Amino acid sequence: YANVDGFDAEAAQVPFEKCPEIDRWILSSLNTLIKGVDRELAGYDPTRAGRLIDAFVNDDLSNWYVRLNRKRFWGKEMSEDKLSAYQTLYTCLMTVAKLLAPFAPFYADELYHDLGGELESVHLDKFPVADEAAIDADLEERMAIAQKITSMVLALRRKVNIKVRQPLQQIMIPAVDDVQKAHIEAVAGLLKNEVNVKEVNFIEGQGILVKKVKCNFRVMGKKFGKLMKGVAAQMSALDQDQIAAFEKAGNITLNIDGQEAVVEVADVEIISEDIPGWLVSNEGNLTVALEVELTPELKKEGMARELINRIQNLRKETGLEITDRINVTVAPNEETDAAIKAFADYIKGQVLADSIEIGDNAGVETEFDDFKLNILV
């Protein structure tokens, strides 16, 4: 996309305060990374420094930032938003090339030159220095919560074999405090897009959720010794309000035969019982309930997304350029017919089609989960 758009890395930078929040987040994370790598190298721990770079590139840059921003690169003109996305990605990659230099000298040099590095070698350039003004710890915390919830919901989808392309109605979250709730509300729109749900709602208290505490005997046995039996009995007897308070505080103090025993959240596993039509996941002090029942309308939209996926694959297979417009004909089928009639404009917009019609054709036989049909592009 950058080559097609003629991106110029030397163009005037979009002011930091005008960058979208997602750009400011990755730049904040980048500068936090620089500080972390510098700290670990100064402490003679290159292994931890390398792992920080690996986590940033894989978890934050590739699997989150680039994936969330693909549509920003699709616009026909070089808008300020699009330029900000390119410049942000370029800054991240160039900085990573410099951070990588001590760990992967040859690859770092190749990446540096691919990005148009000014000097003969990355090893002659200055090592990155963190910009403290660009670091926003609150923003990083919000995005970390979004990443965590996304991971939990996607795991629940896999549990019942529901693809991400199939929209679901809602997730419900019992926030442990106002701070966590505010963080989640701030990223609700992003969450809806990323896990493909219509709504992100909050439960007052535990609502419909029933939680249980499961002790980790391997860890707790060493910690509490002879008190372990009493600790396990009291932990399993906690009611829903006590469990909620335990999650919020991060620990609970028990009295076992006149002796105090402090149990940390990390010592136990808090599990939630699944309820009809829902799946529930817990991780630390975060609980997410996913509604998995499918309405006819949700099924139609899911099929529309499946159709988009097949048409996009056909575009690639036929060697079309990313900017080429197409016309599409789909063979008659009850499921795809309903999806096309309900979501024709959406499908056309996603695959750059001027038209989409239902009719017999001599196109490519295309496989869906339960049937095959011809699609002509």
Question: Model-found features: residue ranges?
Answer:
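Feature 926 captures the class I aminoacyl-tRNA synthetase adenylation module centered on the KMSKS loop
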Residues: 1-377
